[in-house]
A protein has these predicted regions:
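Glycine-rich beta-alpha loop segments
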Residues: 1-40
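A generic local structural motif
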Residues: 2-4, 25-27, 44-45, 64-66, ...
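Short, well-ordered alpha-helix to beta-strand connector turns
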Residues: 13, 54-55, 74, 97
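Conserved SAM-binding loop
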Residues: 17, 59, 113
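Helix-adjacent hinge/juxtasegments
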Residues: 30-72
Length: 133
C-alpha cells in the first residue's frame, strides 16, 4: 500500500516528505523514488539514518519533534498505518488546518478516509483544487 502510494504521488508530480526511516516510510519512498519522484526525508538524527530512497536528507537531531517540520513543510498529510508518531503528525496537521487523509490509519474526527492509495490521491487532488490543502 505505501509503495503504491509513493508511485502515485510521483506520477502526479507531488513531492513526498516523510520521516525518512524504514518500514512504511521506506516503502513509500521506494515507490516515489523508483517512479522518478522527489523524496525528502526529515530525519530524527543524522543523515546516515535515511533509507536508501531518500533523495534529500534533512538531519534535524530533533527526534519526534521533527514531526512539526514534516507537517509544516507539507501541503497535506496522507497518514498510513503507524504508531504515536503518526498520531502526532495527524494532530499537528489538523491544528495547522491542513487536509489529513487517513489510509488505514487512525480514525480521527476531521480526517478524510481513503480505502486505497488511488482514492487517497483523488482526495488529495480535490483538496488541493479547493485550496483546502
Amino acid at each position: 500500500m505505501a509503495e503504491e502510494l509513493g508511485r502515485l504521488l510521483a506520477a502526479e508530480g507531488h513531492t513526498l516528505i516523510c520521516g525518512g526511516l524504514g518500514g512504511v516510510m521506506e516503502a513509500a519512498c521506494k515507490g516515489a523514488a523508483e517512479s522518478g519522484g522527489t523524496v525528502v526525508g526529515i530525519l530524527p538524527g543524522d543523515r546516515k539514518d535515511a533509507n536508501p530512497y531518500v533523495g534529500i536528507s534533512v538531519a534535524t537531531g530533533m527526534s519526534h519533534a521533527r514531526n512539526a517540520i514534516i507537517v509544516r513543510s507539507s501541503d497535506a498529510v496522507i497518514a498510513l498505518p503507524g504508531e504515536y508518531g503518526t498520531l502526532s503528525e495527524i494532530a499537528l496537521a489538523l491544528k495547522m488546518n491542513k487536509a489529513v487523509i487517513s489510509l488505514g490509519s487512525w480514525d480521527i474526527a476531521g480526517t478524510l478516509r481513503a480505502k486505497d492509495p488511488r482514492e487517497a490521491i483523488r482526495l488529495l487532488s480535490r483538496q488541493l483544487r479547493q485550496g483546502i490543502a
